[in-house]
Amino acid sequence: MPEEKVATKKIKLSALCELCNGRKAVMKRPKNLQKLCKECFYNVFETEIHNTIADANLFQPGDKVAIGASGGKDSTVLASVLKTLNERYDYRLELVLLSIDEGIKGYRDDSLATVKRNQAQYNMALEIISYKDLYNWSMDEIVSCAGIRSSCTYCGVLRRQALDRGAAKLGINHVVTGHNADDMAETVLMNLLRGDTARLEKSCTILTQSTGSPIKRSKPFKYSYQKEIVLYAHYKKLDYFSTECSYAPEAFRGTARELLKSLEAIRPSCIMDIIYSGEHLALAPKKKRTQQYKNKKKTQVDNEHEINADGSITIGTREFKDGNRCENCGYLTSNKICKACVLLAGLEMNRAKVSVDNNTAVDGAAKLTKTLEQLSF
């Protein structure tokens, strides 16, 4: 199994841990440049995550919690740390692994083998939900039909719904994911660059729950740096899968990630600074918004998704209240038809164009991602 490179500069072996002053330091923390030995790093890393959980009151005794497990470093470390904290602090949680098989040959099949080993290593139950069983489409088939540029748009929507359906199948009302501080900062940047103010306001929420849904989602790694997660996995010799998804290079998130790396080289605290900014962002009252934005809103059609005879889809953008049920599948949505059903309907009709707002046609599957990124569902 390929091992991910540990992205830290070597420090002098003569340097002592700045906490215990007794053991040699082996790493320098990216968030505060503190030099630590392995033992002190483990303790600090785990304690900070416990404090995040306690401060946000994420869990209650007796909760059954599903860990979104991909086999990657984030979810593997999350499973390991939650097992440790559950025993150390007596959370009294029932932890299970919930994995999604998107159907990406040469990637997901290998990573699921890692998840199955984690199941035995952490003595947790495992449930695997596949796109093919749930939607009758694998990601490889979707990419073949809609193009690689659309892959992350489809996968993000379908994966989120698959996790919820998997949790419901297991009778679980809380799903935790391995989204870390870097992911949170990237999301803020992505929404800022897109001008997506609605999502920008919610980019840094640690606990989310749709109106009418019993399933909560939380991110215990919200303040944990990706570099430290990699170091923890490396020093603990955890079993994880480190190959990137074959479709990921086409994702817009990669652009935000490169921008974040450049910013971090200039200002090491930028990740936490961006998260702090995201936490305190709030939309201005409607009366203060620009006239241009108001005029744009007036030209938008009702949010009724219509599948046309030629395979195109007319997508409106009038807001519906959170908590509606999709008329097709019954899944919670803020619209009449959920986003997953809209995407799947287009695939079933092998569409090559999408009608947006005033029925203007957008030709070519390669433009689908750009179109969907501009819509608020």
Curated annotation (Swiss-Prot):
Protein location: Cytoplasm
Xref: InterPro entries: CTU1-like_ATP-bd, CTU1_C, Ncs6/Tuc1/Ctu1, Rossmann-like_a/b/a_fold, TilS/TtcA_N, tRNA_thiolation_TtcA_Ctu1, UPF0021_CS
GO molecular function: nucleotidyltransferase activity; tRNA binding; tRNA-uridine 2-sulfurtransferase activity
Predominant cellular place of this UniProt entry's protein: cytoplasm
Pathway assignment: tRNA modification; 5-methoxycarbonylmethyl-2-thiouridine-tRNA biosynthesis
Keywords: Cytoplasm, RNA-binding, Transferase, tRNA processing, tRNA-binding
Entry function: Plays a central role in 2-thiolation of mcm(5)S(2)U at tRNA wobble positions of tRNA(Lys), tRNA(Glu) and tRNA(Gln). Directly binds tRNAs and probably acts by catalyzing adenylation of tRNAs, an intermediate required for 2-thiolation. It is unclear whether it acts as a sulfurtransferase that transfers sulfur from thiocarboxylated URM1 onto the uridine of tRNAs at wobble position. Prior mcm(5) tRNA modification by the elongator complex is required for 2-thiolation. May also be involved in protein urmylation.
GO CC entries: cytosol; cytosolic tRNA wobble base thiouridylase complex; mitochondrion
CDD domains (UniProt xref): CTU1-like
Annotated Pfam families: ATP_bind_3 (PF01171), zn-ribbon_14 (PF16503)
Family under the similarity heading: Belongs to the TtcA family. CTU1/NCS6/ATPBD3 subfamily.
Spans through the membrane: none
Transferase as UniProt keyword: yes
Descriptive protein name: Cytoplasmic tRNA 2-thiolation protein 1
GO BP annotations, alphabetical order: protein urmylation; tRNA thio-modification; tRNA wobble position uridine thiolation; tRNA wobble uridine modification
Organism of derivation: Debaryomyces hansenii (strain ATCC 36239 / CBS 767 / BCRC 21394 / JCM 1990 / NBRC 0083 / IGC 2968)
PROSITE patterns: UPF0021 (PS01263)
